[in-house]
Regions:
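Charged, compositionally biased N-terminal leader segments and the immediate start
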Residues: 1-29
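NTP-dependent nucleotidyl-transfer catalytic core
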Residues: 17, 23-42, 47, 52-398
Length: 398
């Protein structure tokens, strides 16, 4: 069934076409700005009357007379307003009946997409080194709402939970686990409070140079596929995902482990991204880092603003992973890729999308869209910081 506005446009447009003896007319139905003007208002009378050499009020009267002969049950009454608008008052009884039907048979009142497409929605995306906190609430809820709406309208939706499960922080955590916990079998108990575990590990990393160096070596071993380190990493990730699943269950969101699009998925693609950017002459070096400079991006000082894709020490960044993910979604023949991330990342996504286009990682058939929302702040008016210890855990809040 069509939306109310679409339905009213059709009904009144047909009556206007009959009155003007034309093939079609645009009723231009809008939501009324004031209750005294009805629920909706047909504003197309003015322009159509002028087009057919009629007085607006005369055309409005003819339309109302025509409709009254077989007034749809949805419309309670029609009135002429001003120089020739038609104020439309809906039937409360019919609205109640439609609302009841919407609850009992929702598919009848929600129009399906005329052309269903494949959509990837990237949302929630917590860092698995830590517990989810209240700052994750908006992205998770907004993303899941978008997913449900798109699916209800008939689109094929690919949920993408782009969790952070890789990087230097995991070398730090594995090293701390070795010292503080010992055998991997003891990890579940030690990780019952991920937040405290992360803060303790970070403090040790900051205060003890020997520990920090050992943590860096752990990262290398992890990246090189050392079995013991991979085993510890997998146990940590599994336990962290359990924390996330507790939150998702409490929120009644539809994300499952099958929807994971983890950073580690792209490990083997990142060097290829750099090689391809180099082959297209898009890379430039700045202070040892590899960057892409596009003319449409500049800083406040007017200097070109780079998208850094590889650090001077050879490490990769979120931008590199995002480019690899875009290329994968292109191969998956996704037509829209939505990124539900807070507004602070607006420039990041503008640059990533532009570089993806310039490099040919995505074409015009793939729409890349950042769905932004406001940042949740702490009492100090700043974004939450896990290491400060004052973050509200989402599981506890719920």
């Amino acid at each position: 069934m069509a939306s109310l506005k679409h339905y009213l446009n059709s009904v009144i447009g047909e009556a206007m076409a009959e009155a003007t003896q034309s093939e079609s007319c645009n009723a231009n139905v809008i939501t009324s700005s004031k209750p005294g003007f009805g629920d909706y208002q047909a504003n197309g009378i003015m322009s159509e009357a002028k087009r057919h050499g009629m007085k607006p009020r005369d055309l409005a009267e003819q339309v109302i007379i025509s409709l009254k002969q077989s007034l749809p049950s949805l419309i309670d009454r029609l009135e002429i307003g001003g120089p020739g608008f038609i104020n439309i008052y809906l039937s409360d009884k019919e609205i109640k009946q439609r609302a009841t039907r919407a609850i009992q048979e929702p598919t009848l009142l929600i129009p399906s997409a005329e052309v269903p497409i494949k959509v990837a929605v990237d949302y929630s995306s917590p860092n698995l080194a830590k517990e989810m906190h209240v700052g994750h609430l908006r992205g998770t809820i907004i993303g899941d709402a978008i997913v449900r709406v798109l699916e209800r309208r008939g689109h094929t939706v690919i949920r993408q939970n782009h969790v952070g499960d890789w990087g230097t922080q995991f070398g730090m955590l594995i090293t701390y686990m070795e010292e503080a916990v010992g055998a991997n079998n003891d990890l579940p108990n030690a990780l019952s409070d991920l937040e405290s575990f992360y803060r303790d590990a970070k403090k040790r990393f900051d205060d003890d140079p020997a520990f920090a160096e050992k943590a860096r070596l752990s990262v290398v071993k992890l990246q090189n596929g050392d079995k013991d380190y991979l085993s510890a990493w997998e146990i940590f990730i599994d336990e962290s995902l359990r924390h996330c699943e507790t939150v998702y269950e409490a929120l009644d969101v539809t994300l499952t482990r099958n929807d994971l699009d983890a950073e580690s998925r792209y490990n083997n693609d990142l060097s290829v991204i750099i090689e391809d950017l180099q082959g297209m002459d898009l890379l430039a070096e700045s202070k040892g880092a590899k960057c892409v400079f596009l003319p449409e991006f500049s800083g406040k000082d007017g200097e070109p603003l780079p998208l850094i894709v590889q650090k001077s020490d050879g490490g990769y960044l979120y931008s590199t992973t995002d480019l690899a993910a875009i290329r994968l979604r292109q191969k998956m023949k996704v037509q829209r890729a939505l990124y539900v991330v807070d507004a602070r990342q607006s420039l990041h996504f503008q640059q990533v999308f532009a570089v993806a286009r310039a490099a040919g990682f995505s074409d015009q058939d793939l729409s890349l869209e950042h769905i932004s929302y406001g940042t949740m702040m702490g009492k100090d008016g700043r974004p939450f910081r896990t290491r400060s210890g004052d973050t509200v855990k989402l599981a506890e809040l719920l």
